[in-house]
Structure formats: C-alpha cells, structure tokens
C-alpha cells in the first residue's frame, strides 16, 4: 500500500477467517500489522465472527500478539459459533480508548437488546466452552466430505481454510450470475454469485456448508453431474 495512503489511514479493518473468501491469517500477519501501526494514529479492528471455524489450524486472536491491545479491538459474534444468527448478539474487547469510543457511539445508536437474549448469550459463554470446537469439527467434516466429492469429479474449487463456505469456479463461458441462474433452473441448487463480492469473484459461486449432511451430499452429487461443462 502506498505510504501516503497509509499516512492518511485512520482505521484498518481485518476479518479472519475472512468473509467471503474463507482465507485465514497466521499470528505473523497480526504481528506485522501491529508493528506497522503501533505509535501512530491508525487503529485496527479485527472482525472475529468466524473465529470458531479454523479447519486446518486454530485461528489466532490479534489480541494474543504482543502490543495488540495498544492498537486494536476484536469483535466477537455469537451468530455463527453459537448458532444465534439473527439475534445480533456480539461484543468487542481490546484497546480501552477504542472501546470507550465505541460505547459512546452505541449509546446514541442502540436502544438496547432484549434481556432474555443477553441472558442466553451469557449462559452460552459461561457453560459451553467445548461447543465451539464441536461446531468447528462439524463444519470441517462437511467441508472435507463436500470438497472430496468435488475433487473426485475434477470440479475446480478453492480449498476452504475457515468460515462456512466453499467457492466453486464457474465453467468456461459462464460468469457467476449466469452460473447461479443455471444451477437454480437446471439443478435446483441455490448458491451466491461471486460478482457482488468484488470483481475477482465473478468467476466463482459461493456454496454454504450450513446444511445437514444429506442435503450437502445431494448438492455435491448434482454438481458432479455437471463435470462435462468444465471439459
């Protein structure tokens, strides 16, 4: 990144495991970011919403890096790891000045959350430490099985290191939106086209692993029937 741009940057927003790509970060990635911006006016926000899903290695926290709390906060969500999607329950920890600023902003933009949801979140955090690992193992098993079926049919995909999605490359002659429509009409499979996620996503569609094994297996079988499109 151009040094002049960095000099004017007030906030760096990181998210690992990344949504939408599923890429993960090592501790060295965070160490480098902290070293670069420590002592400057630039702060770092790390969105750790998919932190529970580290399939090939445990996902590091930016706050575990030396001086992490000097420049960063980390945002946690109960939506994915604790199956509380839609309830909008989460929290932030880290640099005290950033937390105070966030608290001041939230006071003027948020009227509060239904108390029962807060109680449920607190109970989950206090009593289900092993649940996140169980969740990760469930999705790892799904990923391994789904990707193995795609690989057996020589379908090109991006190996998912984290998150809950698999990216399938589109066949020649199809962009992401065209292939998404084809899958709906011909195979009754609903995926997300990659184009809305950025120009580089236009040759891919995103497939969610948040389905039971039987449905994922059936989706994989239907996809493998399209191997001829890639020839």
What is each stretch, according to the model?
Residues 65, 69-140, 144, 148, ...:
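Conserved core segment of the aminotransferase class I/II
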Residues 122, 138-147, 157-169, 201:
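Conserved glycine-rich beta-strand-loop-beta hairpin in the small C-terminal domain of fold type I
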Residues 153-157, 190-195:
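A short linear hydrophobic-aromatic micro-motif
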Residues 13, 46, 191-193:
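Hydrophobic residues in well-ordered beta-strands that form the structural core
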Residues 39-40, 153, 187, 230:
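Helix C-cap/helix->beta junction micro-motif
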């Amino acid at each position: 990144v151009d040094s002049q741009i960095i000099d004017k940057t007030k906030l760096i927003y990181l998210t690992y495991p990344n949504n939408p790509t599923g890429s993960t970060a090592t501790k060295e990635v965070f160490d480098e970011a902290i070293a670069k911006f420590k002592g400057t006016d630039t702060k770092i926000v790390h969105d750790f919403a998919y932190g529970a899903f580290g399939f090939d290695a445990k996902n590091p926290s930016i706050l575990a890096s030396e001086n992490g709390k000097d420049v960063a906060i980390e945002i946690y969500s109960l939506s994915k790891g604790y199956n509380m999607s839609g309830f909008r329950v989460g929290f932030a920890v880290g640099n005290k000045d950033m937390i105070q600023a966030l608290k001041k902003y939230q006071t003027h933009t948020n009227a509060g959350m239904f108390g029962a949801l807060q109680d449920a979140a607190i109970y989950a955090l206090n009593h289900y430490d092993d649940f996140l690992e169980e969740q990760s193992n469930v999705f790892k098993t799904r990923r391994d099985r789904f990707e193995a079926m795609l690989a057996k049919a020589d379908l090109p995909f991006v190996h998912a290191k984290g998150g809950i999605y698999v990216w399938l490359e589109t066949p020649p002659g199809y962009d992401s939106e065209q292939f998404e429509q084809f899958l709906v009409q011909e195979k009754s499979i609903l995926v997300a086209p990659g184009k809305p996620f950025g120009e580089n996503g236009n040759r891919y569609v995103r497939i969610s692993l948040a389905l039971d094994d039987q449905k994922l297996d059936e989706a994989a079988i239907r996809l493998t029937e399209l191997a001829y499109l890639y020839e």
